[in-house]
Amino acid sequence: MSTASAASSSSSSSASEMIEAPSQVLNFEEIDYKEIEVEEVVGRGAFGVVCKAKWRAKDVAIKQIESESERKAFIVELRQLSRVNHPNIVKLYGACLNPVCLVMEYAEGGSLYNVLHGAEPLPYYTAAHAMSWCLQCSQGVAYLHSMQPKALIHRDLKPPNLLLVAGGTVLKICDFGTACDIQTHMTNNKGSAAWMAPEVFEGSNYSEKCDVFSWGIILWEVITRRKPFDEIGGPAFRIMWAVHNGTRPPLIKNLPKPIESLMTRCWSKDPSQRPSMEEIVKIMTHLMRYFPGADEPLQYPCQYSDEGQSNSATSTGSFMDIASTNTSNKSDTNMEQVPATNDTIKRLESKLLKNQAKQQSESGRLSLGASRGSSVESLPPTSEGKRMSADMSEIEARIVATAGNGQPRRRSIQDLTVTGTEPGQVSSRSSSPSVRMITTSGPTSEKPARSHPWTPDDSTDTNGSDNSIPMAYLTLDHQLQPLAPCPNSKESMAVFEQHCKMAQEYMKVQTEIALLLQRKQELVAELDQDEKDQQNTSRLVQEHKKLLDENKSLSTYYQQCKKQLEVIRSQQQKRQGTS
């Protein structure tokens, strides 16, 4: 028997032993691998390779282990998936024993991570989609936490493990290779640092509240469409160290207080201070009343050839000013806010302030008790053109306005749609492009021409030569164009010619104004960039100093550990000598 066949046989027998164990009651179908037609590799999971395949005339995803070390994760996922049945958890159709693989529901929309940060063109999505994804995720996790006789902890909640179907409107949780029973203690750190609760990598004791922490990070990520702790960079231990010291993702300007409160409660250092997933489901279900349109399929950017737009996705919420927060007990300082440069966001903010003033006595009814972090540092704005996060600038006004009677007031979802950047526009360095609502509209209709228009070509002077009357008036607005003259009246012709020349001069002045304004914007942008460069230089100096201090602290800690190790070794040698 070959090595490959021996490994396959060993995997098969191991899986078979686990499946047939009397203590395990697994609800799945054993599938003959010959019935499966593998089409293509689509990615990797908690273990092995994930492939798209056909099984009984339907699309499925199959997970195959690649090594013996992945067999344990395979058994874990098989055992956990066979226990669950929920619309927001990927469905297990069955398993093959030779070769060992899982046959599961196929998600044509890919992972939430790819929708947020994948290759272009990226889809547009609204605040309703973002809130709906988080609600569905919380519903699936709440189901896991409430399972009997033993609840489940996922332990690896993150956008790569959240799949989308039905045009991106339905979310399903996958990758149970790291899931465990709620009584289990962690023996080796699994999961991903950016979404991992501090207690998970600080020690081995943790509860289902570690999934709550991960969910709070995901909520921030889908609203901002930014990778959590992306500004820290480097290896994973740097993120772990920052989270251990109380660093959290930056707060979001214009985010409604109920959402911000829920999000920051999930980030609490103390797991007991975090809400349960059941409470999160109740709060999110209530908030979803203010976010209509979550059932609309995701839209991908189309090509606007007449405007010279690229099909790269842009930000839906780039007006949101962000400031980093640290959850240590310090006062808020150095809050840097990026000014909104577009009139639309200013109008939204004014609406928000008006509604807050009118409903100030009632607004407290929806307060969830903020646990906002304190020590604030500036997060450098991202300049990636593919940002398309959900704009929350108007939602709080809508929540406050309905707090009195509890009935949602219908507002246009267009207030929350994505924005685009026109290539000819000069935006601020805060990646705050001007707003372009996503509405299907035809080309701008031209102004109707006058009936029987008179043109200069129809007229000649008394000497029979053509008049060189400027044609600039044809580009003016209809109300500014000169009236057609009477060809038989010299006075009328003279007035018309004078009007045409004035129109040409008017167009020349307007063109100069436009060019000067454009140059002004360029100079402002250059000045802004210079200021940003100075700020970045200062930030880099501070970061370098911080890293030096951190390195010194770690070196000291290393020396202490080294001394402790030497003491322990010497004690052991003494014991061995005496024995």
Swiss-Prot record:
Any one Pfam family match given in the protein's UniProt record, by short name: PK_Tyr_Ser-Thr
Give the residue ranges for region: Interaction with MAPK8IP1.
1-300
Q: Where is the composition biased (Low complexity)?
A: 361-375, 426-436
Residues reported in the UniProt entry to bind ATP: 42-50, 63
What EC number(s) does the entry state?
Answer: 2.7.11.25
Which coenzyme or cofactor does it need? Mg(2+)
Where mainly located? cytoplasm
Q: Where is this region: Disordered?
A: 301-338, 354-391, 416-466
Q: Establish whether keyword Ribosomal protein is in the entry.
A: no
> Could you describe the post-translational modifications of this protein?
Association with TAB1/MAP3K7IP1 promotes autophosphorylation and subsequent activation. Association with TAB2/MAP3K7IP2, itself associated with free unanchored Lys-63 polyubiquitin chain, promotes autophosphorylation and subsequent activation of MAP3K7. Dephosphorylation at Thr-187 by PP2A and PPP6C leads to inactivation. 'Lys-48'-linked polyubiquitination at Lys-72 is induced by TNFalpha, and leads to proteasomal degradation. Undergoes 'Lys-48'-linked polyubiquitination catalyzed by ITCH. 'Lys-63'-linked polyubiquitination at Lys-158 by TRIM8 does not lead to proteasomal degradation but contributes to autophosphorylation and activation. Deubiquitinated by CYLD, a protease that selectively cleaves 'Lys-63'-linked ubiquitin chains.Deubiquitinated by USP19; leading to negative regulation of TNF-alpha- and IL-1beta-triggered NF-kappa-B activation.
Sites of Phosphoserine modification: 192, 367, 389, 412, 428
Report whether ATP-binding shows up as a keyword of the record: yes
Going by the UniProt record, its keywords in alphabetical order are: Apoptosis, ATP-binding, Cell membrane, Cytoplasm, Isopeptide bond, Kinase, Magnesium, Membrane, Metal-binding, Nucleotide-binding, Phosphoprotein, Serine/threonine-protein kinase, Stress response, Transcription, Transcription regulation, Transferase, Ubl conjugation
Q: Where is the composition biased (Polar residues)?
A: 306-338, 416-425
Annotated control of activity: Activated by pro-inflammatory cytokines and in response to physical and chemical stresses, including osmotic stress, oxidative stress, arsenic and ultraviolet light irradiation. Activated by 'Lys-63'-linked polyubiquitination and by autophosphorylation. Association with TAB1/MAP3K7IP1 and TAB2/MAP3K7IP2 promotes activation through autophosphorylation, whereas PPM1B/PP2CB, PP2A and PPP6C dephosphorylation leads to inactivation. Ceramides are also able to activate MAP3K7/TAK1.
Impact of mutating residue 158 to R?
Abolishes ubiquitination. Abolishes ubiquitination and induction of phosphorylation
Q: Which GO terms describe its molecular function?
A: ATP binding; magnesium ion binding; MAP kinase kinase activity; MAP kinase kinase kinase activity; MAP kinase kinase kinase kinase activity; protein serine kinase activity; protein serine/threonine kinase activity; receptor tyrosine kinase binding
Its biological purpose is as follows: Serine/threonine kinase which acts as an essential component of the MAP kinase signal transduction pathway. Plays an important role in the cascades of cellular responses evoked by changes in the environment. Mediates signal transduction of TRAF6, various cytokines including interleukin-1 (IL-1), transforming growth factor-beta (TGFB), TGFB-related factors like BMP2 and BMP4, toll-like receptors (TLR), tumor necrosis factor receptor CD40 and B-cell receptor (BCR).
Assembly and binders: Can form homodimer. Binds both upstream activators and downstream substrates in multimolecular complexes. Interacts with TAB1/MAP3K7IP1, TAB2/MAP3K7IP2 and TAB3/MAP3K7IP3. Identified in the TRIKA2 complex composed of MAP3K7/TAK1, TAB1/MAP3K7IP1 and TAB2/MAP3K7IP2. Interacts with PPM1L and PPM1B/PP2CB. Interaction with PP2A and PPP6C leads to its repressed activity. Interacts with TRAF6 and TAB1/MAP3K7IP1; during IL-1 signaling. Interacts with TAOK1 and TAOK2; interaction with TAOK2 interferes with MAP3K7 interaction with IKKA, thus preventing NF-kappa-B activation.
The protein here is known as Mitogen-activated protein kinase kinase kinase 7
* Source organism of the structure: Mus musculus (Mouse)
